[in-house]
Amino acid sequence: MNPVIKTFQFGQSTVTLETGRIARQATGAVLVTVDNDVTVLVTVVGAKQADPGKGFFPLSVHYQEKTYAAGKIPGGFFKREGRPSEKETLTSRLIDRPIRPLFPEGFMNEVQVVCTVVSTSKKTDPDIAAMIGTSAALAISGIPFEGPIGAARVAFHESTGYLLNPTYEQLAASSLDMVVAGTSDAVLMVESEAQELTEDQMLGAVLFAHDEFQAVIQAVKELAAEAGKPTWDWKPAVANTELFNAIRAEFGEAVSQGYTITVKADRYARLGELRDQAVAKFSGEEGQPSASEVKDIFGEIEYRTVRENIVNGKPRIDGRDTKTVRPLNIEVGVLPKTHGSALFTRGETQALVVATLGTARDAQLLDTLEGEKKDPFMLHYNFPPFSVGECGRMGGAGRREIGHGRLARRSVQAMLPAADVFPYTIRVVSEITESNGSSSMASVCGASLALMDAGVPMKAPVAGIAMGLVKEGDKFAVLTDILGDEDHLGDMDFKVAGTAKGVTALQMDIKINGITEEIMEIALGQALEARLNILGQMNQVIGQSRTELSANAPTMIAMKIDTDKIRDVIGKGGATIRAICEETKASIDIEDDGSIKIFGETKEAADAAKQRILGITAEAEIGKIYVGKVERIVDFGAFVNILPGKDGLVHISMLSDARVEKVTDILKEGQEVEVLVLDVDNRGRIKLSIKDVAAAKASGV
């Protein structure tokens, strides 16, 4: 073994890259260690030959967190890691997004990246280490790759400014959580959530990260120079310009006309006809190109046609200019039995969004490397195939659905009330019923509307917009509210969500180099204009949260008892609290400080549970009259129950003003009587009287 080790300073952290000791049969393998806190093994394997049956680049990224890394044994019956968690899926996407555009066009060999967290102190997120390791492993592998890339996480505090690669503790106090990745001269990916920061503050964070991760890129270059394998002898296929020119001459004008059809289904039908005609004319005969080659070139003609039209100032596919948002149609309260609902339609994109309120027990239990925790807010995004007029697989959420759901969640989360103000668990589900671009941002708008319809006290309404970019040479056009085709054919997908005051989420994916600060400023400015436009239309339908929760939502009552009384409410083995829940049909959560939250499907159920708890925790008050039940009769008096678990003694002399020979002459067991509390001694024994009740009532007790 001859391991090569490269150590460098990255902000306040010391990063070590090591190769040549572990996973030597992989095409590229790097062990990344950050401050002895996090260690990630990253491997890259590339197939030497492309699969001719695949018409796409088969890149897969797998990020996995091993529980042994944090000194834990997995839960469950099998005691081993299972399917990827949501965190692992999101991090896999985070790594995939900046590296995918850096593989050369036409490269179709399968590439698999596996990032394994093997050690962590649970102080920082291992995702940045995994991204650095991916860059290094690709750089030394010899696989055609236009990297390396750098990556960094940025936090922000109003008083201290930007902070590079913060710990979990520092992130908790930050108003920004942003991950940025890119090359030495370009930003390729941004993923962030914020607490209403300005556009300038968000752009500043992107530029700060880009400057800081240059140290990563330089270190990876030095590692590759010392330990890199020879670059693969791969060349892209020679473009068939003769065939391209022939098809464009025959069909170019018709394709351009096809892209003036504003209805998506009609446009696709017309372009499909033209594609079939091109295949029939230019393939099929001996010596002619294959049908797949003709289709590929036809797709290239579509790509160039749309882009040239846009940068030359012609109307977009649906006739809009570059800054216009598609027509909106907004409804709330569309589903009568749900807690909150909204139907948000923007052009041919539509989301049916539903908000549901639950108890603290409904919170999502997360088993992470940092330990178990509960998440009281969930946002789930569903993208069924019918939303784009297709048949397709139905089943669990895929990577795309998980990623879009997380972006929508990030967008609205900062505007949710604090748990001590609104202690409900909240689940929002966005059902995409139509899709033609930016369904995730439709989910943001719909989620904000549904939450306000449910009566969740949002700090402010939230809206989102997707921006696009087409850049040809020195010409460029920034597009507001992109269609699906514009997303596919453009150079940038730039999604911004926020309130009227500031940005709450920013996601950016760039497919080309050369996105300047000027272009990002223009995109953020146009996004702000569009966001304010959408918020204005949303506010006309529902401008603030409803003052009362939906009648269908559970009723919540908060109360507090003395900590000494917690044991009484819970009872032996939980018997008392179980009995209350079963009899009242309410759910009860008790904290160690005596705070109690009661959730009932109806107000009556919650009130009944509250009264039961008050009865258990109440103390007998001297001088107060109670209606009690005779529990036991003895020679010297009777024991009467006046509160749950609290009996007092009525001495025989306190039964009546007249002389009483036998207690049973006055009382019988099970009888209800009014009693006056005379005294409670230091041992908690209660002295009662029946004969003094009348006098006490007369005196106004």
UniProtKB/Swiss-Prot annotation:
Q: Where is the S1 motif domain?
A: 623-691
Q: What catalytic activity does the UniProt entry give for this protein?
A: RNA(n+1) + phosphate = RNA(n) + a ribonucleoside 5'-diphosphate
Q: Which Pfam families does this one have?
A: KH_1 (PF00013), PNPase (PF03726), RNase_PH (PF01138), RNase_PH_C (PF03725), S1 (PF00575)
E.C. number, please?
A: 2.7.7.8
Q: Which residues are Mg(2+)-binding?
A: 487, 493
Assign the protein's first listed, main location to one coarse class.
Answer: cytoplasm
UniProt entry keywords in alphabetical sequence:
Cytoplasm, Magnesium, Metal-binding, Nucleotidyltransferase, RNA-binding, Transferase
Q: Where in the cell is it found?
A: Cytoplasm
Q: Which InterPro entries match?
A: ExoRNase_PH_dom1 (IPR001247), ExoRNase_PH_dom2 (IPR015847), ExoRNase_PH_dom2_sf (IPR036345), KH_dom (IPR004087), KH_dom_type_1 (IPR004088), KH_dom_type_1_sf (IPR036612), NA-bd_OB-fold (IPR012340), PNPase (IPR012162)
Gene Ontology cellular component annotations, sorted alphabetically: cytosol
Outline the extent of the KH domain.
554-613
Cofactor(s) required for function per UniProt: Mg(2+)
GO biological process: one example: mRNA catabolic process
MF-aspect GO terms? 3'-5'-RNA exonuclease activity; magnesium ion binding; polyribonucleotide nucleotidyltransferase activity; RNA binding
Q: CDD domains given for it?
A: KH-I_PNPase, RNase_PH_PNPase_1, RNase_PH_PNPase_2, S1_PNPase
Q: Which family does it belong to?
A: Belongs to the polyribonucleotide nucleotidyltransferase family.
Q: Briefly, what is this protein's role?
A: Involved in mRNA degradation. Catalyzes the phosphorolysis of single-stranded polyribonucleotides processively in the 3'- to 5'-direction.
| Assembly description | Component of the RNA degradosome, which is a multiprotein complex involved in RNA processing and mRNA degradation.
Q: What's the name of the protein?
A: Polyribonucleotide nucleotidyltransferase
